[in-house]
Structures are given as structure tokens and as C-alpha cells.
């Protein structure tokens, strides 16, 4: 799956995946985006604790929490409560949608975007946004 929905978490070793790219919450509390086996982005929180988890909050903030539920990294995108999704896109970018509030900035131009689960993969940003808006309105 390439999407983390509001209220969902990634436990240590769990990840978003779209084939080539993996966005993983590692055992060492580092949240890392890999292109095949090469790390291309990270929260740089490795070694701060063990067995942290990632939470996509209903306020749009993506947060790494320690086992004691202390935040150790955040996307700083918190705002109004609503339905948000964190998407690992086909272009290698990880983006929080409600309105786009945060991204890793690692996209490769022209790669397209993966679709919402249960739908066919989409080839354009406009098509992806239609599906994201549908999710945000109906959830």
C-alpha cells in the first residue's frame, strides 16, 4: 500500500511501498525513504530511541512518536482536523494531501502518481487529486 490515512500508524518495520520506493518506520526510530536500496531522505531520528511509530494525525501532521508517546519529529503541517492522506507517489515524492501541506521534495519530474487503493493507477496529478478529494469529502 502506498497511502497512510488519517488516524493510521506505521509501527517499527512497517512501510509504504509502491514497488521501487519504500517509506519505512525503522526499528531505530528513523523514518526513511528508499529508492531501491539507497536512502534518499530521512528524519535523522535514528538512535534517539527504539521502537517508535509514525502517526498520520487527523490535523494533517505526520509525527514520529517515541515508545512513551513523545513526539521526536513532525512535518509541522498540523491545522484543522479533517481527513488527510500521506501518499508515497510514483514520482518518488511523499506528500500529505488534504490540501498539499508537506512533501519530502524528492520527486522525479514526469513520473506520474500512483492511485488510491481500490482504483486504477493514475497518470496525472489532476486525476490523483480527484481521487484524493473524493476520499476527503466522503470520509
From Swiss-Prot:
The subcellular location is: Secreted
Disulfide cross-links:
29-52
Domain Bulb-type lectin span(s) in chain numbering = 1-109
Quaternary data: Homotetramer; antiparallel.
CDD domains with a match to the protein in the record: B_lectin
Q: What's a GO cellular component annotated to this UniProt protein?
A: extracellular region
Q: What is this protein called?
A: Mannose-specific lectin
Q: Which organism is it from?
A: Narcissus tazetta
User: What PROSITE patterns does the record tag this protein with?
Assistant: BULB_LECTIN (PS50927)
Q: What else is known?
A: Has a significant inhibitory effect on SARS-CoV-2 in Vero E6 cells (IC(50)=0.8 ug/ml). Viral replication is fully inhibited at concentrations from 20 ug/ml to 5 ug/ml, and 50% inhibition occurs at about 0.4 ug/ml.
Query: What Gene Ontology molecular function terms does this protein carry?
Result: D-mannose binding
Tell me where it mainly resides. secreted
InterPro entries registered for this protein in UniProt:
Bulb-type_lectin_dom, Bulb-type_lectin_dom_sf
What SUPFAM superfamilies has UniProt attached to this entry? alpha-D-mannose-specific plant lectins
Q: State the tissue distribution.
A: Detected in bulbs (at protein level).
Which biological process terms from the Gene Ontology are attached to this UniProt entry?
defense response to virus; regulation of defense response to virus
Superkingdom in the source lineage: Eukaryota
Residues bound to alpha-D-mannopyranose: 26, 28, 30, 34, 37-38, 41-42, 44, 57, 59, 61, 65, 72-73, 76, 83, 89, 91, 93, 97, 102
Q: Where exactly are the transmembrane stretches of this chain?
A: none
> Which key words tag this protein in UniProt?
Antiviral protein, Disulfide bond, Lectin, Mannose-binding, Plant defense, Secreted
The function of this protein is:
Mannose-specific lectin. Displays antiviral activity and therefore may contribute to defense against infections. Shows agglutinating activity towards rabbit erythrocytes.
Amino acid at each position: 500500500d502506498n497511502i497512510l490515512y488519517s488516524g493510521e500508524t506505521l509501527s517499527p518495520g512497517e512501510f509504504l511501498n509502491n514497488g521501487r520506493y519504500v517509506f519505512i518506520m525503522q526499528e531505530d526510530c528513523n523514518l526513511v525513504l528508499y529508492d531501491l536500496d539507497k536512502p534518499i531522505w530521512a528524519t535523522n531520528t535514528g538512535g534517539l530511541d527504539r521502537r517508535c511509530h509514525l502517526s498520520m494525525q487527523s490535523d494533517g501532521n505526520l509525527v514520529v512518536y517515541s515508545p512513551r508517546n513523545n513526539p521526536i519529529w513532525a512535518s509541522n503541517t498540523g491545522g484543522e482536523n479533517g481527513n488527510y492522506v500521506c501518499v508515497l507517489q510514483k514520482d518518488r515524492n511523499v506528500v500529505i494531501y488534504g490540501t498539499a501541506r508537506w512533501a519530502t521534495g524528492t520527486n522525479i519530474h514526469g513520473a506520474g502518481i500512483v492511485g488510491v487503493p481500490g482504483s486504477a493507477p493514475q497518470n496525472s496529478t489532476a486525476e490523483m487529486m480527484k481521487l484524493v478529494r473524493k476520499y476527503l469529502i466522503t470520509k
